[in-house]
Amino acid sequence: MNQLEQLKQFTTVVADTGDFQLMKQYTPQDATTNPSLILKAVQKPEYRGLLEQAVRDYHNEGGVDAVMDGVLIAFGCEILAIVPGRVSTEVDARLSFDTEATVEKARHLIRLYEQRGVARERVLIKIASTWEGIRAAEILQREGIRCNMTLLFSLVQAVACAEAGAQLISPFVGRILDWYKKQAGDQWDAAANAGDNDPGVRSVRQIYDYYKKFGYNTEVMGASFRSTAQIVALAGSDLLTISPDLLEQLARTEGTVERKLSVDLAQAGNIARIPADEPAFRWQLNEDAMATEKLAEGIRLFAADAIKLEKLVAEIAG
């Protein structure tokens, strides 16, 4: 049995792509998108028609902003025709520090999905794990709008999300590894930071164990992988969202995949609670240079790709 099929025995496998044609062969349960993945997809000839249709359908309703939302919904609906579960659709990263605007955008996206006949239970609204984003999620969850908290790099972000009642978090693995490699430079020891010792893997394991120890219902979905080794090291996580390239590698690789994370192991661990009110959140995040820098960088990158997509829409709209 290949590694992908073995992984599915322990973990819900999610496709991390906007390229819905590509995901079919891996039969994922759910799918995740973000501005960068949508931008990448719409530049392919086979998806140009979706973009042009969104311009025709939405431009007269509210210009470029309306078309941007329409593109997200169009991709989401196509994806939901393939996966049996949920799709994650991301709120504009430029709203990451505005609770009210994030809530309004999320409500609007859900309305658009419901107009297309998609039940809100099949949609996760992706929101950056800033303090303001977490407060937005708290409001939305009470309204039955389920949230996927993204750009999450630290335990305090994860705890704040769980205490807010978020449906799901997406702790990043690869971007954490990237930061530590860059900091170490020529002194980086790849062997010492592989497998279970990978700093990104350690971060997700710490979050998973904390959640299971203290009985939080928020789902843990590891994200942002650089290798199949990172994925295999997190077998047993509630979900893992994986790019098509790495899904392909897992599907082609024979070899044993063992459960690495489990509720029993987590509950047996000696784990202390940490505070995650606003002062504690801001202080602990500030003290974590990696999390602070990667959160800020991630917001900038997603915002930049949203702007590129807007320009593409404006060109088509004429």
UniProtKB/Swiss-Prot annotation:
Give GO BP annotations, semicolon-separated: carbohydrate metabolic process; pentose-phosphate shunt
Which is one Gene Ontology cellular component term of this protein? cytoplasm
Pfam families, sorted: TAL_FSA
Does the keyword Transferase feature in the UniProt annotation?
yes
As for subcellular location, the record says: Cytoplasm
Assembly description? Homodimer.
State what protein this is by name: Transaldolase
Q: Which organism is it from?
A: Cupriavidus pinatubonensis (strain JMP 134 / LMG 1197) (Cupriavidus necator (strain JMP 134))
